[in-house]
Amino acid sequence: MENIRYLYHSLLVEGSARALHWNFAASRDRKAKLRRPEFAALAHHVASEDVRLKAEADAAPSDDARLAAAVAWVFRAQQATPDAGVSLGYFPLDVEGGWHPSYPETTGYLITTLLDYAAQYQRADMRNAALAMADWEAEVQMPSGAVQGGAVAPPDKQTPAAFNTGMVLDGWCSAYEASREQRFLDAGIAAARFLVTDMDEAGYFRTNGAFVSQRETKTYNCLCGWAMLRMARLAGDQRLERAAVEAVEAALKRQRKSGWFANNCLGMSSIPLTHTIGYTLQGVFEVGVLAERPDFIAAAEHGLTSVLRKQRRDGSLAGRFDKRWNAAANFACLTGSCQLAVVAYRFVELFGNRDLLILADRVMSFVKRTQRLAGDDPNMVGAIAGSYPILGGYMTGGYPNWATKYFIDALAAPTLPVNLARGAPRCTLRLSVCSPLFNLSES
């Protein structure tokens, strides 16, 4: 049924028969490559995924071991490039050597992840690596203040992208907070000004960049609002703060009664990825917290609860959902699963929501079991794949760095059961429009 929904939306709703053909052709070519001896390690990985999933459940390595392996992989992904950026990811079937060039967008928000990790675990090497990333981002920033879409490219090949700019702005905010170096504040202010000028009268960002569909404004761009609001507070810029709130108000105009958001995918908005659903929910929630907007937080809770309730018995989530929250893909988008868990853990941290804690833990239990802590190819060890199975429909056949980034964020979340046991949640903001979550005993 999930595959039937995917085909229906691909052919009849999105009208993308050509894209569907090329996706199948690319999948066929990747499977053919797996027969070649140089890809033996990945072929073994593909053949043994289900067996290993059960073995990981039986072994149950500690979260500390998983977290350390994931952080080590990000460090390896940075070292795999000739600059201080982080490789887009490891895709042995797609490029010689497996490693793609540095990717400005996700290097940007990895800065925040690594600085948080460095502070929590007293890792000066990770702090230095993160600040080097922030310096590199400033070096490749476009004259307009924007950040380029796609992997790093020479100036004459760069095209600006609002979303990518927002994610690097997030990194510059964190780098400035950690170092108080003026160059990070200057780069961030330039990026924030680009984002403000890129917004239309309705509050939507206009510049998608060259690597996503151009026919619509993207709801998930509202995540830029969080970084904009952070910079507004650092720079004392009220205009920027108003723009951040307007970006989320615009996104909420596209939320349906079910909690689902329209125009919310890289390329197939009738069945968005959990990846872009996660981006939107994080943006709505975090701006709601900083701006003290209970309506934003309630909207995020509604969407988050609706999608997390759709998890399968093993904790996995379908990679795509239609407007009625019907599963529309049979693969799991592991990135999106981690992102949704991150937002859920933030809800629990601030508001003490036990039901969301249970749901997020189930999702992360599945994702953890897909992580390899040993193997013949060290470039796979510690990373999280784009999809489960790895030849599924998101970032097929490889390990995008942002999947591991959100895995780290989820595992490094506060020790939530301890916080809950101590009593009152941290945040005193009252959710006047939130309805109670469902009773898990009924699911």
Model-derived segments and spans:
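Glycan-recognition and catalytic cores of secretory/periplasmic carbohydrate-active enzymes
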Residues: M1-S443
